[in-house]
UniProtKB/Swiss-Prot annotation:
InterPro entries: AP3_beta, AP3B_C, AP_beta, ARM-like, ARM-type_fold, Clathrin/coatomer_adapt-like_N
Localization of this protein: Endosome membrane
Stretches for region Disordered: 480-501, 736-797, 811-835
Record text on subunit structure and interactions: Adaptor protein complex 3 (AP-3) is a heterotetramer composed of two large adaptins (delta-type subunit and beta-type subunit), a medium adaptin (mu-type subunit) and a small adaptin (sigma-type subunit).
Domain of life: Eukaryota
Role noted for this protein: Part of the AP-3 complex, an adaptor-related complex which is essential for the compartmentalization of the endocytic pathway.
Entries under SMART domains matching the protein: AP3B1_C
Lineage: Eukaryota, Amoebozoa, Evosea, Eumycetozoa, Dictyostelia
UniProt family annotation: Belongs to the adaptor complexes large subunit family.
Protein name per the record: AP-3 complex subunit beta
Ranges for the HEAT repeats: 90-127, 327-363, 397-433, 434-471
Length: 1108
């Protein structure tokens, strides 16, 4: 009851009064300190947004509320940001810093929502930042966040397909997850990212099958579709006849509709197998030889037929239809019939799929025939599909039941429904020849109906049935003659009996009845059908056909085009019958006496010539062409003998058996359940099912990787020992330490919220409030503290104090007069502020003027020409040899072959907007083993998009790619001041900076440098210079990887600060590296800049350099 009242209360936000609320009033409430006012305003905004109103005006106020603690407000803010992320890219980017910080929030809901918002911002410039966030989220402890990371991978791939390879690496991590929530989302991302990479699924196939029932229902739909394609490509066809349309499948015993035995095999008597055809026995036995993994798939998906989600039931049905043996595919029929009772949309989709299934395997739905009977409430589309299904299910055993139902349908007042039923009757008569005669006479009774629509449809169907019956008579006579030659008396009697039943149809009475309808029936298609029937069987009614032709000639000019064409054909056939006295009719060997009447022959000839002359001037070109052709056949003076000898074979020939075309048969080319199958044409993104392989691939690829499992006995012993230890340790339920941690966390959250609030107020032009922010102090355990004291790295009196982390004090190590805290970590200077000294950078900047060399063109690809390159670094005060923002790249071109290469140049540049390459002058020739250096100037205009071009020479053109390196998109700022305090004043003029930071351990390369340095210091009795203390041993590694310049450091060189600026946007960047612990060596990296994209990329680059 409370939920209902709450929903009613929430609906008030969508009424007209709320939707017309002024934006200014909402903006005022969003700036209110009350969470209740903010929540009310956000609900109004979302309601207005959902009704199509533009509320982007409130964006600045909404963004500021990202930092609030209230979870419901944050959810609404994120919903707002997702909506405007794509249409207002610049505005959405304003919140990227806060969203990044939310990725570290304690709440899993906030972390997942932040990632969802970030991945929804479709700006390619921040794609690297999004990928970094995904890399962090895939390793999150919460499955809810990892699930959001999986969906974010799919979004990033849609934004930039070039990032597929790194995204696949992240996807592999998620596929190894054991949480069904994450695994289902990962497979959905797999379907968007690389649906053909089945090699990624081999190791996880059995796990997916076993956990399939635990996935969420919408993930199950995607997973079932992928497993269907996987089974079709990895397993052999379980039934060699499953694609044969003309073979009836084995029929299972009919059970009650709501049966609990749906997932069990029916027990049949042992003597039931002898009743089956040999083909059906093979089909039944083939299921026993199915692959074990194939059997696991079928067994795991069968329970999903009872899912409440209709899409899941449809996906399982599609899987069984395409991948299961024919005998087992019949199990899905009952479930599909069950979901027919859902809404009209579901009913249409289900009936469309059933109509396609029935064309191939009618036995799947024969036990449920009555479920397809039409109800008075069925819509028109449902009626047509049900009638088609009923005709496909018609057999000699149930045709009586179906025709009895059709008899009631033709009495309906809806004439379109009756016309569709008449078509279904004709289809049943074609499928079951035994009822053709009764159907024909039943349709004859409908010719007296008052509705022209019913009469016209009856005539059209009668035409088809008469043609079909006449064709069957000819085939039976030919078969009878063959049997006579073989003297098989039993077969002769059977055929004669069947022929006599068919010959009982009185064509003359039917044609006579149809001819009378021409005087009243005005439907063109029906009139054309009657004329065709009279012309086709004119030898049966030699007196009626000429009179009908006479009436049609009189009204020829007023007839429809289709009737005119059939009139010409009728005249042609009558002329041939009356003029060819030596010929025989189609079915009789004797010529009727009426065709020998000369007077009638003369009248037919005159009427035929008259109608040919009328058709000669008709507006329709088909009628004109037909009249000229017939006139050339019958009244041509040249070569008359050669034409007359074949005229009868042309005009009066044996017609093929009429075939019915159905849209369901045309839909067979598309996969069941797909959008293309419904609309009957290839929709965007459709991929067809692969064919079964002739030889199954190696099944060993699906063997899971063996993991180390500890000894069970040792595990039990450890568990028992742990229980004994817990008995003697008296630990309170909530320890004091945990309570202190919670209090500290709450204080930190309040301080960060206040800090970010001030930041947004400054950003949007509000009054700046000069208040310092205090952060959580960094505490280290007692062992690490004692270790640091023993190593002689603390100068204090036994008390380690935390560092004041004000924006600039944290960067430069300078504190205010009222703060007595010292920097924490190696190099802390006791009580008082930590002094920073100017760094002597000249010895380092000169040694890193070039970056590490990289390969641009391999000689194995180009036939002997190798090209590697490196970035030429410049300082801020150096003059550019080209335009600003360009990188200088030095190419080392070498001929490693035995022949001379000529005309080496750069062609076919493929660059993004704003990018440019100033190529070198063409090289006329380069001798074997000769090396040449060239410089090019490149403007990348992006931190992630590559520059693509081709190297051309006499061997051909070879595509190459220059990728921007974030460490080379910087220019060091050369200090020109004498003291650090002057630098601080200079930096303060720029404004407040945004910051990204991370703590991590050193990699092997840096550890080796530090260890070697410590060993050397011990051997030299600690008398080495400054270059061997603190972070100095790894400084060359940092400068080699990133184009920075060191500005200042503390005395122990455990904290070093760098400065640089971006090449593209000319934004200052400040970097600090601080050594925190020695065991294990841990470093803290801080990067501050207004360019958040570069900051995030630079932090990742710095982390990669230090963790090598």
């Amino acid at each position: 009851m409370d939920t209902v009242l709450n929903n009613i209360n929430q609906s008030r936000y969508f009424n007209d009064s709320t939707a017309n609320t002024k934006i200014e009033e909402i903006k005022k409430h969003l700036d209110s300190p009350s969470d209740a006012d903010k929540l009310e305003s956000m609900k109004k905004l979302i309601a207005m947004l959902s009704k199509g109103r533009d509320v982007s005006e409130a964006f600045p106020q909404v963004v500021k509320n990202v930092i609030v603690k209230n979870l419901e407000i944050k959810k609404l803010v994120y919903m707002y940001l997702v909506h405007y992320a794509e249409s207002q890219n610049d505005s959405a980017l304003l919140s990227i810093n806060t969203i990044q910080k939310s990725l570290n929030d304690q709440s899993q809901v906030i972390r997942a929502s932040a990632l969802r918002v970030m991945s929804s911002i479709r700006v390619i410039d921040i794609i690297e930042v999004i990928i970094l966030a995904i890399e962090k989220s895939v390793k999150d402890t919460s499955p809810f966040v990892r699930k959001a990371a999986a969906f974010a991978i799919a979004k990033v791939h849609k934004l930039d397909c070039d990032k597929q390879e790194p995204l696949i690496d992240l996807l592999e991590i998620l596929l190894n997850d054991t949480s069904t929530m994450v695994l289902g989302a990962a497979i959905v991302a797999f379907n968007e990212l690389c649906p053909q990479r089945f090699d990624l699924l081999h190791q996880h196939y059995r796990k997916i099958c076993q956990l399939l029932a635990d996935f969420d229902e919408w993930s199950q739909v995607i997973v079932l579709d992928i497993l269907t394609k996987y089974a079709r490509s990895q397993f052999r066809c379980p039934d060699s006849t499953m694609n044969d349309k003309n073979i009836k499948q084995f029929k299972k015993k009919s059970k009650s509709f709501y049966s609990d035995e749906e997932d069990q095999e029916d027990d049949e008597p042992e003597n039931s197998l002898y009743k089956k055809k040999p083909l059906e026995r093979d089909m039944f036995d083939s299921s026993e030889e199915i692959d074990m993994d194939h059997r696991l798939l079928l067994k795991s998906t069968l329970p999903l037929l009872q899912s409440r989600n209709n899409a899941v039931v449809m996906a399982v049905s599609s899987l069984y239809f395409y991948c299961a043996p024919s005998i087992e595919a019949q199990k899905v029929g009952k479930s599909l019939v069950r979901i027919l009772r859902s809404g009209p949309e579901v009913q249409y989709i289900t009936l469309t799929n059933i109509s396609t299934m029935v064309t191939l395997r009618p036995s799947m739905f024969e036990p449920h025939l009555s479920e397809f009977f039409i109800h008075s409430s069925d819509p028109e589309y449902s009626i047509k599909l049900k009638l088609e299904i009923l005709t496909r299910l018609a057999t000699p055993e149930n045709i009586g039941k179906i025709l009895k139902e059709f008899k009631e349908y033709v009495k309906n007042e809806d004439k379109k429904f009756v016309a569709a039923t008449i078509q279904a009757i004709g289809s049943c008569a074609s499928t079951v020849p035994d009822v053709t005669e009764s159907c024909i006479y039943g349709l004859m009774s409908l010719l007296s109906n008052q509705s022209t629509v019913v009469v016209a449809e009856s005539v059209i169907v009668l035409k088809r049935l008469l043609q079909l019956n006449a064709t069957n008579e000819k085939l039976e006579k030919l078969e009878k003659e063959k049997e006579k030659e073989k003297d098989v008396k039993e077969n002769q009697s059977t055929i004669s009996k069947h022929s006599s039943s068919n010959n009982s149809i009185k064509y003359d009475n039917i044609i006579l009845h149809l001819s009378k309808l021409l005087d009243t029936l005005q439907v063109p298609s029906a009139r054309a059908s009657i004329v065709w029937v009279i012309g086709e069987y004119c030898y049966r009614v030699p007196l009626v056909a000429p009179d009908v032709f006479r009436k049609l000639v009189k009204s020829f000019s007023d007839e429809h085009e289709s009737v005119k064409l059939e009139t010409l054909n009728l005249g042609s056939k009558l002329y041939v019958q009356f003029t060819d006295n030596n010929s025989t009719t189609t079915t009789d060997n004797s010529i009727p006496n009426e065709f020998k009447n000369e007077r009638t022959k003369e009248k037919i000839t005159l009427m035929f010539q008259y109608v040919l002359n009328l058709a000669k001037f008709d507006q329709n070109y088909d009628i004109r062409d037909n009249s000229r052709m017939l006139k050339h056949f019958y009244f041509n003076t040249e070569n008359t003998q050669s034409i007359n000898s074949n005229i009868k074979q042309i005009v009066i020939n044996q017609k093929p058996i009429p075939t019915e075309t159905s849209i369901s048969e045309d839909r067979q080319r598309f996969t069941l359940g797909s959008l293309s199958h419904i609309v009957n044409h290839t929709a965007l993104g459709y991929t067809a099912l692969p064919d079964f392989p002739d030889v199954a691939p190696d099944p060993s690829v699906r063997e899971p990787i063996q993991r180390w499992i500890p000894n069970q006995q040792s595990q039990q012993q450890q568990h028992q020992q742990q229980q004994l230890n817990n008995i003697f340790v008296d630990t309170p339920f909530y320890s004091d330490e945990e309570e202190e941690d919670e209090e500290e966390y709450d204080e930190e959250e309040e301080e960060e919220e206040y800090e970010e609030q001030n930041e947004y107020e400054d950003f949007f032009g509000e009054e700046k409030k000069n208040k310092k922010k205090n952060r959580k102090q960094q505490n280290y355990d007692e062992d690490e503290y004692n270790q640091d004291i023993d190593d002689g790295e603390y100068d204090g009196e036994g008390e380690v104090q935390a560092e004041d982390e004000d924006d600039f004090d944290e960067l430069f190590g300078i504190t205010n007069d009222d703060n007595n805290q010292t920097a924490n970590g190696i190099g802390g200077g006791g009580s008082g502020e930590e002094e920073m000294d100017k760094f002597d950078f000249e010895n380092y900047i000169n040694s890193t003027t070039k970056s590490v060399k990289k390969i641009l063109l391999k000689p194995t690809i180009s036939g002997g020409l190798s090209i590697d390159y490196c970035f030429i670094r410049i300082r801020d005060n150096e003059e550019f040899s080209c335009q600003p923002r360009y990188n200088i790249i030095q190419l080392n071109i070498k001929n490693q072959s035995d022949e001379t290469f000529t005309d080496i140049s750069i062609i076919n540049k493929n660059l993004i907007d704003g990018a440019d390459i100033s190529e070198f002058d063409p090289i006329e020739s380069i001798e074997p083993n000769q090396a040449i250096q060239k410089q090019i100037y490149v403007l990348f205009n992006s931190t992630s998009q590559s520059c693509k071009f081709e190297i051309s020479f006499n061997k051909g053109n070879f595509p190459v790619t220059l990728t921007p390196i974030i460490g080379e998109l910087l220019i060091p700022i050369v200090p020109i001041y004498e003291s650090i305090s002057q630098w601080k004043d200079e930096f303060e003029e720029v404004g407040e900076f945004k910051q990204v930071d991370d703590q991590f351990e050193f990699g092997d390369q840096c550890l080796d440098k530090l260890n070697n340095n410590n060993n050397n210091n011990n051997n030299n009795n600690n008398e080495s210079g400054d270059e061997n203390i603190g972070l100095m041993p790894i400084l060359p590694i940092v400068l080699e990887g990133i184009n920075l310049i060191p500005i200042a450091s503390n005395k122990l060189k455990s904290k070093i600060q760098f400065a640089s600026k971006t090449l593209l946007k000319d934004e200052n960047i400040y970097v600090q590296i601080q050594l925190l612990k020695q065991q294990p060596p841990t470093v803290n990296c801080i990067i501050r800049s207004n360019d958040q994209v570069v900051s995030a990329l630079l932090l990742k680059k710095l982390k990669d350099v230090l963790q090598k």
